[in-house]
From Swiss-Prot:
Keywords: Signal
One MF term in the entry's GO annotations: peptidyl-prolyl cis-trans isomerase activity
Family: Belongs to the chlamydial CPn_1058/CT_355/TC_0634 family.
Organism: Chlamydia muridarum (strain MoPn / Nigg)
Name of the protein described by the UniProt record: Uncharacterized protein TC_0634
Alphabetical list of InterPro entries matching this protein: PPIase_dom_sf, Trigger_fact/SurA_dom_sf
């Protein structure tokens, strides 16, 4: 259950739409103000973005989300200042952008009168953390209201994103697009070879004996069509050697190492299926090729759902970018704002104690 909760909270970082305005806006938060909480983080709280006349994004908003993410992913390290130091420093840029995304989408949702029932928010909080929220007060100086605000904003952002992106994507993916993509996959597959093979290792007391045994193994495999590992091993053992047989490999061209591909291509298949012995530190190697054929795909009926899902993912990126650009235009977002906030010359937003 804890793993599921961690994944659920970590998924908040998947929202990658970011924008905002008024870099350095002071509002009612002096840039010199300093708040310290039990997490070992000194927060230089100030307004980072002004969304509208009623809504601003502050350093504390970002820290609150960092606190929730840290506790969700690393509860066993909640009292480790060094662990938080590493986590907060690494995650700050990503979480900063995600919080700005959420504020902008929440503002958009408000305009469109899209709301989340408080009961749903409380249920989500309980599903993630249980009913005991005291660790947030003890280690992060966060109230239940602070937690509610973060989770509520995330859920609102997810809902509006679903309406503005996912619903449009579903309408765009047509049966014709699926068929065209399948045909393209078929054409690509026809250019790919698929190799089915094993690698045999022959060991013996001397190099001469090993080569002699390897020659007999090669001869036997090239004479018949049957594959009998046990009989082959018995034959090698009777000659004073040892046979080690790999599992059966099924590999496409791109999945083959250069050495394996070279060895397989030297086999005169299908007239032969076992190549010449190759010297190796672990013993003599014999490559046994069972099949080399053009890659084939399953029927469209079996791949349709998979192809449709892939197309939706691709179109979602496009729709998300469109939605992002509209939000930027509406709220006057300048991409350089994020760069300024994260630059080395920018005023510190928080300090690790």
């Amino acid at each position: 259950m804890r793993v599921v909760k961690r994944i659920a909270v970590a998924c908040y970082l998947g929202i990658t739409i970011f924008s905002g305005i008024a870099f350095g806006y002071e509002g009612s938060f002096p840039s010199s103000s300093l708040e310290q909480n039990p997490s070992g983080v000194a927060i230089h709280n100030r307004v980072l973005f002004k969304i509208d006349e009623d809504t601003v994004v502050t350093t504390l908003d970002v820290i609150h989300k960092l606190n929730i993410l840290f506790y969700s992913t690393c509860p066993q390290l909640v009292d480790s200042v060094s662990a938080r130091s590493q986590y907060y420093s690494a995650m700050w840029p990503v979480v900063l952008e995600s919080v700005i995304n959420e504020f902008l989408m929440a503002a958009d949702a408000k305009e469109k009168k899209i709301f989340i029932d408080p009961t749903s928010v409380n249920q989500e909080i309980e599903a993630m953390f249980g009913r005991d929220l005291s660790p947030f007060a003890k280690f992060f100086d966060m109230t239940p209201g602070d937690i509610f605000n973060v989770v509520h904003r995330v859920l609102v952002a997810q809902r509006i994103e679903g309406m503005m992106v996912r619903s449009r994507v579903m309408l765009k993916v047509t049966p014709g697009m699926v068929r065209d993509r399948y045909q393209k996959l078929v054409e690509d597959a026809s250019q790919v070879s698929q190799w089915t093979y094993r690698v045999l290792t022959i060991k013996a007391g001397s190099e001469l004996l090993a080569n002699k045994i390897a020659g007999k193994v090669q001869e036997r495999l090239n004479e018949g069509d049957s594959w009998d590992k046990e009989r082959l091993a018995a034959m090698v053992l009777s000659q004073g050697g040892q046979l080690i047989c790999s599992d059966e490999f099924i590999r496409e061209d791109a999945q083959l190492s250069a050495a394996h591909k070279k060895a397989l291509e030297e086999i005169n298949f299908p007239e032969e299926r076992c190549g010449k012995a190759l010297e190796h530190a672990s013993g003599l190697k014999l490559f046994v090729l069972f099949d080399c054929s053009t890659k084939t795909l399953e029927p469209l009926e079996k791949m349709e759902a998979q192809i449709k899902q892939r197309l939706m993912m691709e179109l979602a990126e496009e729709e998300e970018a469109n939605y992002k650009n509209k939000l930027r235009a509406r709220y006057g977002f300048d991409p350089s704002i994020i760069t300024q906030l994260l630059s080395e010359d920018a005023p510190q937003l928080f300090s690790l104690l």
